[in-house]
From Swiss-Prot:
Protein name as it appears in the record: Palmitoyltransferase ERF2
Membrane topology summary: Multi-pass membrane protein
Membrane-traversing stretches: 80-100, 107-127, 226-246, 275-295
Transcription regulation listed as a keyword: no
Domain DHHC: 181-231
Its biological purpose: The ERF2-ERF4 complex is a palmitoyltransferase specific for Ras proteins.
One GO CC term, this protein: endoplasmic reticulum membrane
GO terms (BP aspect): protein targeting to membrane
Catalyzed chemical reaction(s): L-cysteinyl-[protein] + hexadecanoyl-CoA = S-hexadecanoyl-L-cysteinyl-[protein] + CoA
Compartments reported by the entry: Endoplasmic reticulum membrane
Domain notes per entry: The DHHC domain is required for palmitoyltransferase activity.
MF terms in GO: protein-cysteine S-palmitoyltransferase activity
Main location: endoplasmic reticulum
């Protein structure tokens, strides 16, 4: 063998090139579609690569993670929503493994079907409430100064009304007007009932509260999902506790010859006893929260309105008027639970990003607010 043949470098096989292309495709699929963190993208990359709106994030302290091409989202915080989801999944799986067959043949198949329906609906509403757009308002719509490409600082002081709450015109003499407030961070006039969430750092339509267990704001577009999630979660826990209770104490009917005492029953069916205790403990927080939101929706109030204007207000001069109350409990309940349409998203994350779109640009807060 000659020296040239001995030290020559063979070309890379086509299989190796195809493997590298596959790895690159998988990496792009995972980081750009399946799970996307816009803060990890290189600044200015949207100018070279055709990007979607969810892949562009220039605002400070706005930390979202997007899933499935921007169709789902979650705030970059402690993953308490993951713990909540696991706490819903595990009891359902244990039920189907250890309880479903026994209930099907010893009690009634319809109970298994009913619980499965409750569980699936709970999971569905959990995903919708925790990972959908709650009604985020677009930024930089009402900027009180001219914008140039080189500088995004205010050119002049904005008018005084940008620093005060103004009231819309109203007819009734015994009612106060609906107040509007300008958000210095988002640079928009907020619609009535909208509020700025300090966690999401965004203005939300009909902002109710920021739920740490769902890791998402609860607003106009997902409040209905939140209500039904609470309802079916409570119903599922009650049904599971009853089913597990029946299984544990089935020996009392004299139909279980191998079990004669409570100790022997929980020794033979430990998962049934565990599910019974788990479902009862799981009711401690969701059940009172459900009752509280039934009360709020009966008056068409939000959580923020109740705690800021109703609860603990002793000064008669600070009279709060709920302009959204229809004065009918049933109509208020219908509006919040069934009647109100979800509406469309004002910031469509799946649309193609247009370079220079002011909604996604970083602008400094107004000077009077930042001082």
């Amino acid at each position: 063998m000659s020296r040239r043949e001995r030290y020559s470098v063979e070309p890379i096989p086509n299989d190796a090139n195809e493997f590298q292309d596959n790895v690159s495709f998988i990496h792009k699929f995972i980081t750009n579609w399946l799970i996307t963190d816009p803060s990890l993208r290189n600044p200015g990359s949207e100018k070279n690569v055709k990007a979607k709106n969810y892949q562009v994030q220039k605002h400070e302290n706005v930390q979202f993670i997007y899933l499935c091409g921007g169709r789902l989202r979650s705030v970059k915080q402690k993953p308490i929503n993951v713990v909540t989801g696991i706490s819903i999944l595990i009891p359902g799986i244990l039920f189907w493994i250890f309880e479903a067959k026994w209930i099907w043949f010893h009690v009634n198949p319809s109970i298994v079907i009913l619980f499965s329906y409750f569980w699936l609906i709970t999971v569905s509403f959990f995903i919708k409430a925790s990972m959908s757009d709650p009604g985020m308002l677009p930024r930089n719509i009402h900027v009180p100064y001219s914008i140039s490409n080189a500088n995004t600082s205010p050119k002049a002081s904005p008018p005084d009304e940008y620093f005060n709450i103004i009231s819309l015109p109203y007819n009734a003499e015994d009612h106060t007007g609906v107040g509007l407030k300008y958000c210095a961070t988002c640079h928009i006039w907020r619609s009535p009932r909208a509020s700025h969430c300090s966690v999401c750092n965004s203005c939300i339509i009909s902002h109710d509260h920021h739920c740490v267990f769902l890791n998402n704001c609860i607003g106009y577009r997902n409040y209905k999902y939140f209500l039904w999630f609470l309802l079916f979660a409570v119903l599922g826990c009650i049904l599971m506790s009853v089913i597990s209770f029946i299984h544990v104490f089935y020996y009392r009917l004299g139909m279980e010859t191998s079990v004669s005492t409570f100790r022997s029953s929980i020794s033979k069916y430990p998962v049934s006893f565990l599910l019974c205790i788990y479902s009862l403990l799981a009711l401690v927080y969701p059940f009172p929260l459900l009752i509280f939101h039934i009360f709020l929706t009966s008056y068409n109030l939000t959580t923020r309105e109740y705690f800021n204007n109703v609860r603990g207000v002793k000064n008669s001069q600070n009279h709060f008027t709920n302009h959204f109350d229809t004065h009918s409990i049933f109509k208020n309940l219908y509006i919040n639970w069934l009647g109100r349409a979800r509406g469309f998203s004002l910031v469509r994350q799946t649309d193609s990003y247009q370079i220079g779109d002011l909604r996604f640009e970083k602008l400094d807060p107004l000077q009077s607010f930042s001082s």
